[in-house]
Amino acid sequence: MKGKYHFKVYNKKLLFEFDINRNITFIQGNSATGKTTLLNMMYDYLLSGRGSGITVETNAKFMVYLRKSLTATWKQELGNLTDTIIFIEENNRFIQRSDFTKFVKESGNYFVFINRKALKMLPYSVTEIYRLQNEYSEEEKKQVYTLQQRYPTLTYMNGNVNLIATEDSNSGLEFFSKVFNNIEITSTYGNTKVISFLENIENTDILCIVDGAAFGCFIKDLISTCNQHPTKHITYWAPESFEFLLLTAKTINFPELDKILKDTYNYVDCIKFVSWERFYTFLMETKSNGQAAYDKHSITQFYITEENINKVLKIFPKSIQLLAQAGKEYKTMNLF
């Protein structure tokens, strides 16, 4: 299953309108923010159609699983579904189990979790965690609910960074070491170890770089760690992935690259790629060749030439560019 899917769910008083872009989406928020109302409306529509007083307009097949059935297990109810967007509420404990995790990764369906807790065994994007926001629309004469991204991909930096910690221990680490040549750089050796690394390290003024496409399950913990250790001055940057940066910077080029980057959801088959991070790695490994052949385990000289480093720098956020520029100025000053 791949693609972007639009939903418009409404009755006489309420309207929910949103898009689902990836195979795993979270809608979070406190009680009484509309999450359960949305699920109940969609569930009632599935049971009774427009006779329920509810309309669902969408280009997707969908299923709503509210609670454990008295007569069937989740496997019996969901196991045979394909190419379907499955909405699941948070009271279902089975979503924490390894067999359900396997189902999410291999079934070829999309999943929308109405869930306040992270699912640590699933790789999902920082940008696909939402909260519902609402306002009254005079045009619609309804209370209108839309999705708002919950977490930023870049937090404010005061300009001082003494340590950069990246989850990558291979090509990404080597590349960033070349770019930020006046700042100490280290690896946390995977996204599962980012939090413990930050909690235990004594350094201050730390920039943490993570692959946002698969870091959603840890982002709340990362923000909590930043807040719990204010004297460490921890900030973070969560681009989709290192390979995404290389592709966006056009360090390599091939037909349809622009279309793929603009509408990635149309190209990522979730039964083949559980996250966009893996898809971008696949592109780099299969679309590069010769001197530009990409190796995730060790950066090749092609990608750390001045020309390609500058290409990548141009697509960095401004505050990250300034860090790298400070490194260049420092290096130049040391030559004289």
Label the model's feature ranges.
Residues 87-89, 108-119:
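Structural recognition of the conserved hydrophobic beta-strand(s) that form the central parallel beta-sheet
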Residues 38-40:
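Post-Walker A alpha-helix
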Residues 92-93, 127-336:
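Acidic, divalent-metal-binding catalytic cores of TOPRIM
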